[in-house]
Amino acid sequence: MSLPFLASFKKTVAKLDTVGVGIQKTESWLSTGNYALNRALSGDFMRGIPVGKVTLFAGPSGSGKSFIAGNLCLEAQREGFHVLYLDSEHAIDVDYLGKIGVNVNDDALTYISVTTIEDVNSVLSEFFSNYTKTYGKDNTTAPKTLIVLDSLAMLSSATEMENYAKDGIIKSDQGILAKRRKAMLRLAVGQLGRLPIGMVLTDHVYPQDIMMGDGSWAITNSTKFSSSIIGIITKLKLKEEAEVIGVKMKFETYKSRFAKLGTKVTLEVPYNKGMSSFSGLVELLEEMGVIAKGTQIGEKLLWVTEVNGEIIKFKEKDLDKATAEKILKHPLCAPMMARNSVPEVSIEEIDAVTDQDEVPQLDTEALIKKSRKVKLTTE
């Protein structure tokens, strides 16, 4: 039943600075630049992090959180976003950002060094205030922005800094820190919902007491409740013979309103060129039952699948965008993609696959027979 005063009521409350009227759907996404990571975050190979919400990458020191943040800056700039980078670690690697293609000029990336939670509050308040004065709320034509805060764990409080200046001793009150961090995140979440702005946080995680718990990583409650998506990253060294040439990381979906929890992907991020779009994709597609191991040619393994009647055969090192996007039209991939991007697959086919308890296994033997007369798709 409609109430007669609703029209004027909505018009009045819409004028309030901190109020929004109407349900906001997540319609804008920013790709991470990596298909497997996209899928783990959003349940969709083509989408990555949601605009208008908070995404958290958490992990132990040196796990690669800042590398992921750097790649997101690159993808954001490719999509026309401005990047606001808040750095509490004071360790941003401009050379690395330049190597992977991030534009660090002021017109493309605004870099601000912060020390305390109060610093972040002031910066965000000023930015949101100026943004809404210039473009208003719910403005679909306003320029998009990505805010990166790297990292939450290194932020102190103004009280800590005052005590240090007075006594030369760092006195940390975790209770005060937690409350102020929570207030800062409330401010961000409240503003982001009506603006074309995405926010990425990095944070440390801490091992729980193995004697009292399961030995898994612990995430602070303030970030757990304010983030729409949380991924936990752990690190391996990426080596070429004995030389360490980058970061090899394991990513696991800890929280997501859009994807299956517990999804795991392994990603490689070389120092000299950043993350490949295809890193982790072959392993994920094999796990899903989308592709199968075909024949061996020398030391190289061929992978095969069949999509819409077409046999697709490729070597992992030769996988390219055109081949990957053909494979991602496979019905088993369709539930994880925007349906309007895969018109060849009917809704009935998607539902039939989604409703199955187990992923159907590929008939590898039949596929190999069919593929013998087919040239490599990537040739």
Predicted segment positions?
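Phosphate-binding/switch loop-helix module in NTP-utilizing enzymes
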Residues: 115-194
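C-terminal regions of RecA-like/P-loop NTPase motor modules
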Residues: 1-20, 30, 238-379
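Residue-level preference for the first positions of well-ordered beta-strands
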Residues: 54-56, 82, 144-148, 198
